[in-house]
């Protein structure tokens, strides 16, 4: 089963929890990590998720309300972080201690029970990506900041 929960939205910080799987095998993805680390910990606790229960982080773009505590949280919990090359080049955090993974437009990311499909969007950032998430039965489109809906964006979200 595919589930999502907004942990924060807006200029004070964006974070979305996406979960896939049954009660025994659950994959958890954090899309954006724009909150402060204590606030993120508290909101994960409210959702019944331990910080170490996150399997991956996907950063959509380099703006502070999306990237916030991503590096500190990833390093503390040893969680891989996916972002575009352009996003990584735009931030002042070159070292993710081997946890950085490069996400590319239309290249699938396999997290076991959860598959991600990043896609480019128009936005005032260096190389912003949004994504769809699927568990094989359902598909969720995650769209945070978007300049406007292009034909490509609509194509990528078809079926969500």
In which residue ranges do the predicted regions lie?
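Conserved beta-strand hairpin/beta-sheet module of binuclear metal-dependent hydrolase folds
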Residues: 1-47, 127-145
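Structured catalytic core of nucleotide-sugar glycosyltransferases
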Residues: 2, 6-16, 61-70, 74-75, ...
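A structural signal for the main folded, soluble domain(s) of proteins
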Residues: 3, 29, 52, 98, ...
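Active-site metal-binding motif and surrounding structural segment of the metallo-beta-lactamase
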Residues: 37-83, 159-160
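Structured loop/turn residues at beta-strand edges in well-structured enzyme cores
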Residues: 49-52, 98, 114, 155-159
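Conserved Rossmann-like nucleotide-binding pocket used by diverse enzymes
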Residues: 58, 117, 142
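Metallo-beta-lactamase
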Residues: 83-137
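Active-site-proximal loop/helix segments of hydrolase catalytic cores
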Residues: 141-160
């Amino acid at each position: 089963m595919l589930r999502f929960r907004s942990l924060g939205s807006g200029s004070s910080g964006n974070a979305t929890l996406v979960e896939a799987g049954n009660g025994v095998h659950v994959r958890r993805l954090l899309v954006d990590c724009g909150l402060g680390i204590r606030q993120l910990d508290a909101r994960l606790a409210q959702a019944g998720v331990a910080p170490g229960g996150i399997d991956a982080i996907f950063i959509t773009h380099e703006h502070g309300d999306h990237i916030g505590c991503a590096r500190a949280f990833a390093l503390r919990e040893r969680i891989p972080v996916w972002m575009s090359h352009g996003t990584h080049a735009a931030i002042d955090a070159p070292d993710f201690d081997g946890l950085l993974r490069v996400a590319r437009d239309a290249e699938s990311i396999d997290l076991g029970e959860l598959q991600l499909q990043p896609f480019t969007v128009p936005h005032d950032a260096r190389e912003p990506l949004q994504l769809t998430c699927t568990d094989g039965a359902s598909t969720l489109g995650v769209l945070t900041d978007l300049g406007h809906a292009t034909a490509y964006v609509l194509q990528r979200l078809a079926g969500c």
